[in-house]
UniProtKB/Swiss-Prot annotation:
One of its GO terms (molecular function) is protein serine/threonine kinase activity. This is Cyclin-dependent kinase 1. The modification Phosphothreonine is found at residues 14, 167. SUPFAM superfamilies: Protein kinase-like (PK-like) (SSF56112). Keywords: ATP-binding, Cell cycle, Cell division, Cytoplasm, Kinase, Mitosis, Nucleotide-binding, Phosphoprotein, Serine/threonine-protein kinase, Transferase. It comes from Schizosaccharomyces pombe (strain 972 / ATCC 24843).
Amino acid sequence: MENYQKVEKIGEGTYGVVYKARHKLSGRIVAMKKIRLEDESEGVPSTAIREISLLKEVNDENNRSNCVRLLDILHAESKLYLVFEFLDMDLKKYMDRISETGATSLDPRLVQKFTYQLVNGVNFCHSRRIIHRDLKPQNLLIDKEGNLKLADFGLARSFGVPLRNYTHEIVTLWYRAPEVLLGSRHYSTGVDIWSVGCIFAEMIRRSPLFPGDSEIDEIFKIFQVLGTPNEEVWPGVTLLQDYKSTFPRWKRMDLHKVVPNGEEDAIELLSAMLVYDPAHRISAKRALQQNYLRDFH
């Protein structure tokens, strides 16, 4: 800690307080995340230290990963600080700022670039068996060159995803996969792909795709667009803990109507991401090969 000087508190992240800080020797500005531990007296779980050290190795090996770089891990007085490169703009703020200029949509080429970088970052981490579990526009940071990077990758597995954040707001459900909402105990990389699909649609539409205000409202908002799932479209769905046979039966809508300004290739990719059955949801690796993203290779 003695190498860093805190400049100001810049936010309350999913896992704790985030500070802007300066490295005393180099003068480099960084973001320091103070990880809040559920049981302060227990200290930092060794599994968490191992996970985060692995994350740092992953980060170091390739700076083209579209993941925010983890620069340092500080462990002092039963507190854990993670030091990341400092990026002060996230995708939510970016989209809000565009709205303030009176623009009704993001430039389609920019949506394409951001979606490529998002899928590329997710693929990089999935290929190393790391799942994010909490992707949302606030977790996607934009650097000075206008490139999108993923923050907080790998932290969910180490620390869990809390139901509330530090200001006690409920963590957003808008990007949460249906298998998680319906109580599945086993989930995999598909949860991130669902979130990517929701973010992708939001960039095109300029409004959230499934803005639920409770878990059941979120589930119903998904059903109203994609139709109420059954065993035919999603084998095993009726066995999930929170599935109810009394759910209203909605018919699937045409995604072209839900995302009216999406071009054909974009809707095709979106459809492959928003598949109910996680086993048939497109992988990040395959998504990179789709027509919509092919220009960026």
